[in-house]
From Swiss-Prot:
The record marks 82 as: Lowers pKa of active site Cys. The gene is lipB. InterPro entries: aa-tRNA-synth_II/BPL/LPL, BPL_LPL_catalytic, Octanoyltransferase, Octanoyltransferase_CS. GO terms for molecular function: lipoyl(octanoyl) transferase activity. Its EC number is 2.3.1.181. This is Octanoyltransferase. Gene3D superfamilies: Bira Bifunctional Protein, Domain 2. It catalyses: octanoyl-[ACP] + L-lysyl-[protein] = N(6)-octanoyl-L-lysyl-[protein] + holo-[ACP] + H(+). Catalyzes the transfer of endogenously produced octanoic acid from octanoyl-acyl-carrier-protein onto the lipoyl domains of lipoate-dependent enzymes. Lipoyl-ACP can also act as a substrate although octanoyl-ACP is likely to be the physiological substrate. It comes from Paracoccus versutus.
Length: 155
């Protein structure tokens, strides 16, 4: 099903936490890249509460996990798996859509697509990384880290 947001193919289903972020960027600065970077930082901060190091990569939107436990890519670089996808749309500088974080989805559902159009990398989840984290645990971590990345606006 096609939707009007950034990004290419992805999968949404049970076991993912979808977060639709609606913020007025007229009041926070009309900078789409800074907004996406803040979304990524928000997820990275939340993952850090579970001692999981999420990372961003130039040219690839989303949050990535280095996988030294997997075979290297053909070019010798370390394999990385995506744990969170980001797809946003702006209308009159108000954001729509947002992020999806893999908590415990059936990762087999990704087999038929190239997630977000990025070749050579896989997909992971909190549970796949050996963390017994539930939706409620992630929700608390996201709540705690939100204001660090999206500070309240004055008056």
């Amino acid at each position: 099903h096609a939707v009007g947001r950034g990004g290419q193919y992805t999968y949404h289903g049970p076991g993912q936490r979808l977060v639709y972020v609606m913020l007025d960027l007229n009041r926070r600065g009309r900078d789409v890249r800074a907004f996406v970077k803040a979304l990524e930082s928000w997820v990275i901060d939340a993952l850090a509460e579970f001692n999981l190091k999420g990372e961003i990569r130039d040219g690839r939107v989303g949050v990535w996990i280095a996988r030294p436990d997997k075979a290297s890519l053909p070019d010798g670089s370390m394999r990385e798996d995506k744990i969170a996808a980001i797809g946003v749309k702006l209308r009159r500088w108000v954001s729509f859509h947002g992020i999806s974080i893999n908590v415990e989805p059936d990762l087999g559902h990704y087999a038929g697509i190239v997630p977000c159009g990025i070749q050579g990398h896989g997909v992971t989840s909190l549970v796949d990384m050996g963390l017994p984290v539930g939706m409620g645990d992630l929700d608390l971590a996201l709540r705690r880290s939100f204001a660090r990345n999206f500070p309240p606006l004055g008056g």
